[in-house]
Amino acid sequence: MNPINSFIFPDIPKDLGKILMKDDQQLIVVGIIGKSSTPDCNKLVGFNLLTIHPALTDTDPRDGRVKFYFENDGKILYLHFETTFDQHVMADLLAKAVQTGIQDNFINFNSTVRTRFARVLLFAIQVCHMIVLVEPSSVFDTSYLSIFKSLKIIREKYVLKFLPKLLKSSNLGNYMGKEARLCSPRFIFFFEGTSNIKPEDVEKLDGLECSVEEEIYKMLRNEFIITNNSAMSLFSIPRSKKFVFYNSDKRAKSNPLADSIDLLMKYLNKPAGGQNDDDEDLMSRLRPYDGYGMSAWSVGKSKRAEKKERSILALLKEHVAEAFEHGFDDSASKYRGRGHFVIPSFKTWYEGFKLLHKIFIDNPSNSSYETNDPDYKAFLQNFHKIIDIDERFFAEICEHGLELAMVNYKDMLPHHYSSTFHEKKYEQAHELFTRYARGPEVERHEQKLKDYCDSIWLNGKQQCEYPSLRGNPCALGKHKVKDPTEHSSGVIFVSACNCGRTQGHREDPYTIRQGNYDFYQIIAKSCSSCNVLERVKFPVFEPSSNDFRAAEFINKNLSNLMSFEHSNRTPDASTHPPMTNENSPHLSGSQKSQDSASNLTFSMDEKRDEENKSQKFGTQGEDEDETLEQETVNEIVIKVGEHSEDKAILRQPSTTEYLPGMLHAASPAGLLPQFPSWSLVCLGPSSIYTHNSGIPEHVQSGFLSGANFLLPWDVSVRLEHAQSWAASYEKIRNRKKNTSQPKSSESSNTFTLKIFLGVEYECLRGHRFIMSGPDTVLRGGSGSIVRDSGSKVVFNDMPIYFPCPCRSSNIAQLMRVHVVTPKAPVNVIVEPKVRILQGTTQNCLTFTTGLTEPIKLSQSAYWILRLPFIYEGDSGPLMPPAGVTVANAATHGVLMAGMFGIRESEISEELL
């Protein structure tokens, strides 16, 4: 039989059971627990107690396993606990966790390790008289403090409530008393790590142990793990004996196989000679255990020489002797004598041990176990929560970060806000949350933050966000509407009325009617001129009954639209026939409009433009004292022909279906919109405008400084048939001038017209300005005459959108065309066409007024044509572009060249 016996619970051999159960043998139970770094996980190696080194056995360590060690003639029962703090047990647990995927992060894994160790430690505190906490290093691991503190809370809050009841009901463990344990176990701290102090220097080792004892005692007292009353402490610390031991024997960490091989080689290499005491000692060290290779008789008779040496086993025996003599009473003098200490027989103790093992180890490991005792149930449910200080810490900082993030999100929230604002606020809150949140609870708290923010936004804070025709979202709360006009973005623009005299605030439109018609009807009530001025009526839908609806159609003319865009013609070629002479702007007598009047619409190609620019004429001003700089003068030849008998067959518009969008070149024939998107009014006589001072502020408000001048356009008109009306015109002119000087035939048939034009742009802040060319804003000086020519705006496409010169970098839109007609026996005609490009030049729409004939303007008058504020095709509104620059302005939309023309009129003396 080996000098020391062992078995693994609960498999106790019969022969060992008889030895332990005989004569009610009393034993001091010493628990060995802590950490180990060797594969065998045996922490008794440093005690020099084992006869066979654990490395030579085939037993694999396992979490929660308890191994009993005792000597035949000894009084100490060693309980060796294998826990998750043992390195190789932890490694096996980690490998299983990785393989199964149960633990998804280190925090959770570490929490599991700590919880399992704490269960075993609590169990050891209940069944042991002494506990040796083994540390393989030379430094005390302060992470034990949190475990000790948590176990003290668990014991006081749960264990002392349920354990006495369970022990009483089972008739086992009555010897444990009210404390439900043998005593307040005495803790010994055993450090296996070698220090820099040599084993021979005992005084320094003792000094180190004393200093470590003081530090450990202070930490335990500060955390209230030990108190003056040891019965109320988790465990006790001896008052007058050492409880810290540093192992200075390097053999405790030696590898027996490697050491044996080294010693054998040393022995074999030794010169031959007689044996001495050193050789005998060397041979004994080669044996894997005492008595190896010797007869059983010699082993039984031989006794180990007891040398007085410094060892943990000697320290333990001192404490054991005190336990047998007086018991442990480590309380202060005030509480001394009240402590509970009992040494039961092994048989009695073992029955209680099995019950406590089931309560503290087996039942918590069984996930399906259920108990009727509420206190025990609370213990099982809350043990992990209390022990797991890391998870609690990370949960608390996540909760703290979550609270701050919630407050940050709620701070200064508007009454309603958009999804973009919501996401921005959430990102700000989430950024604040991530400054604090750490650990495995981050994802769960992130989801809580997301749900919280979404719930606030969706429950009464969600903005409608329905986009306006200018791209601004509705600022009202989420609501159901029957009509788009019920939306409101809260954005206010500044715009002028139809005549341009009055500026007012306009709401961001949600329908074409709001943008192109309703606003101008409303502001007309505030304007002193709009409702009294002469105006041109544009064709609109006039229902014949109350049963009318919007037309449903597929734009079959889309291909025709694309082909006509580049030739500057409308698809209806019969209404506007092309010019026969491509190289001359002259109008022949055979080119008559339907009312038999001579008509000219300028639609110049590049070749004609070059020819026109080469013709220079002197300009004359009837009302100006100063002459303008020489500019391009266009000569128009007006011929008088016979009235055409043929009339174009016009299709009557529908009275039951209306056009849902705006009129454009490819709109179905016979469909008209419900309201006009254009406006043409006569502001008054031409004398309103004076080229010296520009457009008066009281007539047209909101113009930028120097940008309120119209551009003069001089057009030379030559008469081919003076006998028609030219002779009468010259006769009246001569009479008016009181002169009878005859003129040559050529000069009497030619005269110059001065027409003042202005293409006006207006930004959303109400800034207005005239442009002198497709890429140039008019810059007129104070007190000087603008010398720019109007031919640039007549013979070029003018962009619909252009950057406003104001500081806010707004986009201005072409909103008005100013025309001051001359005092002459001709009429200026206009036929505006707006081409809006949608991505490419092949995808565009040309919007028209809907009139079948060009508009004839009266003589000597100031006319203003107001263009649509919003454009809408068959598929819906066309959003104004963003990022408009001078270079790309013409790529978004243009007012097409060829808008202006001249038409003859009846001669009367009132015109002169």
From Swiss-Prot:
Similarity field: Belongs to the SMG8 family.
Q: Name one GO biological process term.
A: nuclear-transcribed mRNA catabolic process, nonsense-mediated decay
The segment annotated Disordered runs over 565-630
General function of this protein: Involved in nonsense-mediated decay (NMD) of mRNAs containing premature stop codons. Probable component of kinase complex containing SMG1 and recruited to stalled ribosomes.
- Locate the compositionally biased regions of type Polar residues: 570-602
Provide this UniProt record's keywords sorted from A to Z.
Answer: Nonsense-mediated mRNA decay
Origin: domain of life: Eukaryota
**Is Glycoprotein included in the keywords of this UniProt record?**
no
Q: Under which name does UniProt file this protein?
A: Nonsense-mediated mRNA decay factor SMG8
